[in-house]
From Swiss-Prot:
It holds the Pfam family Phage_integrase. The keyword Transferase does not apply. The active site is at 148, 172, 244, 247, 270, 279 (o-(3'-phospho-dna)-tyrosine intermediate). Residues 2-87 form the Core-binding (CB) domain. During recombination, the heterotetrameric complex catalyzes two consecutive pairs of strand exchanges, implying that specific pairs of active sites are sequentially switched on and off in the recombinase tetramer to ensure that appropriate DNA strands will be exchanged at both reaction steps. FtsK plays a central role in this catalytic state switch that turns recombinase on and off reciprocally. The reciprocal C-terminal interaction between XerC and XerD may also participate in the enzymatic switch process. This is Tyrosine recombinase XerD. Changing residue 297 to E: Abolishes DNA recombination (in vitro).
């Protein structure tokens, strides 16, 4: 079992070098694959002897045991990548994961806010306080750009150009993209940089654009708590909240106003158009409005 766990670490090291996966993804893979090794060990199996039927049984057992379909899909992805690696490195002469069946994932529509709700959320911070001025700027940037929360809290001073009105984002897979900020976000960034950030830094020299109260990089969890706080002030139902609520609103509202799907894909940093297409459910609302406005029998 120790040898198998060691091979998993070798695989994760190789995966990090080849794919530059996020630390959270690597840690999730480590947990999933360690669980798999333990499961195999209890059945007298190893990474060298496990067959396709064994791996399929593991996946089925996880699903029947209450594993979410998304968690099972992640486990399947980790298993496939591991055995592809073992086959490539000639540790095995076959790849038992090649024909594993994928668990069916329910298509969940992203939670989104109306434009009026977004406006209330953006107005919630008290801009006469440096901390809330920072939050105001963050919310404006988030809605203007559709960044992931992890991308937002990771921004540095060198990532923004207020003169050009763009932000440089290093997204998933270390892919870089430039996203327009818009006049409103630029205004609040300028205001924050003059009246908020110096107070938060209190003499500390760091390049982080949105530092915490301790002049450090803010965590995603901290910003999520801030969003929930302002949502309460704005009278927004918690059922509509998620860490990426403004990212979803960004995509939804762009499409509602006629933006091309591929443009939205580029702005969001999606590598696959199908990931962006889930937002097209909002087009129904836009079509209904157009129908009511222009059809003689509407």
């Amino acid at each position: 079992m120790k040898q198998d766990l060691a091979r998993i670490e070798q695989f994760l090291d190789a995966l990090w070098l080849e794919k530059n996966l996020a630390e959270n993804t690597l840690n999730a893979y480590r947990r999933d694959l360690s669980m798999m090794v333990e499961w195999l060990h209890h059945r007298g199996l190893t990474l060298a002897t496990a067959q396709s039927d064994d791996l399929q049984a593991l996946l089925a057992e996880r699903l029947e045991g209450g594993y979410k379909a998304t968690s099972s899909a992640r486990l399947l992805s980790a298993v496939r990548r591991l055995f592809q690696y073992l086959y490539r490195e000639k540790f095995r002469e076959d790849d038992p994961s090649a024909h594993l069946a994928s668990p069916k994932l329910p298509q969940r529509l992203p939670k989104d806010l109306s434009e009026a709700q977004v406006e209330r959320l953006l107005q919630a911070p008290l801009i006469d306080q440096p901390l809330e001025l920072r939050d105001k700027a963050m919310l404006e940037v988030l809605y203007a750009t559709g960044l992931r929360v992890s991308e937002l809290v990771g921004l540095t001073m060198s990532d923004i150009s207020l003169r050009q009105g763009v932000v440089r984002v290093i997204g998933k897979g270390n892919k870089e993209r430039l996203v327009p900020l818009g006049e409103e976000a630029v205004y609040w960034l300028e205001t924050y940089l003059e009246h908020g950030r110096p107070w938060l830094l209190n003499g500390v020299s760091i390049d982080v654009l949105f530092p915490s109260q301790r002049a450090q990089q803010m965590t995603r969890q901290t910003f999520w708590h801030r969003i929930k706080h302002y949502a309460v002030l704005a009278g927004i139902d918690s059922e509509k909240l998620s860490p990426h609520v403004l990212r979803h609103a960004f995509a939804t509202h762009l499409l509602n106003h006629g933006a091309d799907l591929r443009v939205v894909q580029m702005l969001l940093g999606h590598s696959d158009l199908s990931t962006t297409q889930i937002y097209t459910h909002v087009a129904t609302e836009r079509l209904r409005q157009l129908h009511q406005q222009h059809h003689p029998r509407a």
